[in-house]
UniProtKB/Swiss-Prot annotation:
Entry keyword Cytoplasm: yes
Reactions performed catalytically: cytidine(34) in tRNA(Ile2) + L-lysine + ATP = lysidine(34) in tRNA(Ile2) + AMP + diphosphate + H(+)
InterPro entries named in the record: Lysidine-tRNA-synth_C (IPR012796), Rossmann-like_a/b/a_fold (IPR014729), TilS/TtcA_N (IPR011063), tRNA_Ile_lys_synt (IPR012094), tRNA_Ile_lys_synt_N (IPR012795), tRNA_Ile_lys_synt_subst-bd (IPR015262)
Name listed for the protein in its UniProt record: tRNA(Ile)-lysidine synthase
Keywords: ATP-binding, Cytoplasm, Ligase, Nucleotide-binding, tRNA processing
UniProt record, GO biological process: tRNA modification
Lineage, opening ranks: Bacteria, Pseudomonadati, Pseudomonadota, Gammaproteobacteria, Methylococcales
Annotated S-S bridges: none
Principal subcellular localization: cytoplasm
EC number: 6.3.4.19
Amino acid sequence: MRLSLDSFRAGLHPGSTYRVAFSGGLDSAVLLDLMCQVRRVSGIGVRAIHVHHGIQPEADAWSRHCAAVADRYGVALDILQIDGRSRPGDSPEAAARTARYHSLEASLDPGDILVTAQHLDDQAETLLLQLLRGAGLAGLAAMPNAVPFGAGILHRPLLRFGRRDILAYAQERGLSWIEDPSNRDERYDRNFIRRRILPQLAGRWPAVAANLTRSAGHCAEAAGLLDRLADTLMAAATAADEPGTLVLEIVQRLQPDEQRLLLRRWIHKRGLRAPPAKLLERIRKEVVETAGDRTPMIAWAEGTVRRYRHRLHLLPPSADFDASWTAAWSGETPLTLAGNGCLHAALCPGPGIDPDKWRSGRITVRYRRAGDRLEPAGRRGHHELKKLFQEAGLPPWLRDRQPIVCIDGRIASVGGSQWLASEFAGAPERVNIVVHWTP
Ligand SMILES: Nc1ncnc2c1ncn2[C@@H]1O[C@H](COP(=O)(O)OP(=O)(O)OP(=O)(O)O)[C@@H](O)[C@H]1O
């Protein structure tokens, strides 16, 4: 489609404040020019944002170029300084991109529309890259035209226009831009596809970019439908008294493909990246489908799926929890438990620790040790903590994480004030020390 002010405006997502992601390259130079023209005719607010990655030696010169261009348009430019370096083993391209998107996302105010300059050929490259990675529908949907992003929206108004139309527009308008030398580096997959593969395909199928983009559109529609189906399955399977937990029996009644869809959505909604397909299938077979009363679990880098008492639980990783940790506590100020929330103590009416015993003893906090026993307040006889936890239906993976408050080395309370030792418990009708645990 020919790129003109009218054809561009016709597809622009409605809004009143736009932030142009301006790298200084050809595509975003055209986008900024178009947005400034729209501003002239319709009075929208336009600001530009440039991300300074601090990686390439030219980064300072690019920032200066962007500032000069923005100045000529009379547009305010925010320069976001980020550390776009990758960690060993990560792709530098992906690390810079992730850091850039995070900083752009955080910079938006409510209602802002962030516009970026990806076009039809970028979309075709993205689809090919996703196919080569073996992506599922969500990946093949490639880049959406508009999605919620931070406090605002991310919108790509040039997706309908090809690289050639964008170049023609820039030349016609006499725009200036900078060329990033790394765009020619064919060690990067995207550059290889753009420079070697797509021209070959276009020699035989001139409409290749438009057709691939159309396929991405079909995938996007199907992916949206499946998301809605997954939400319906999840609403039906979620335990009413424990949001975030699924009722095993309901999940088991679904077909295998529905189970996979539901598991992926459940993990995604928790903000975790789904495991690879093979591992997801193991979760389905070994955790969901296994018969009997077993309590299987499967962990991957992003989390753990566990089955316990007819429910499925999803836990984020807990890297810094140390079961051998112990500390003295004044009881006056909250105590932070590494990787396990915090404790605080307050005087409250009702069951709790006798304030006199609390003040006169030496308080320490630790975790469970083999053979720990307790006589619960109001009950006769000592019981192993393990038995008390089982009796209360506490899932096994939470048992070692219950903080144990000791007075002079003897257990006074467990899990905040969930279990109180009779030897330290105050009279329940009086005001006592209540230990709260916020995991
Ligand atoms: N340094 C930058 N500062 C501000 N915006 C940028 C910067 N780099 C890129 N952008 C914005 O992102 C768009 C896409 O850039 P580019 O194609 O280089 O990114 P990419 O790494 O391939 O990411 P994507 O997959 O989103 O296209 C640009 O057109 C521009 O709008």
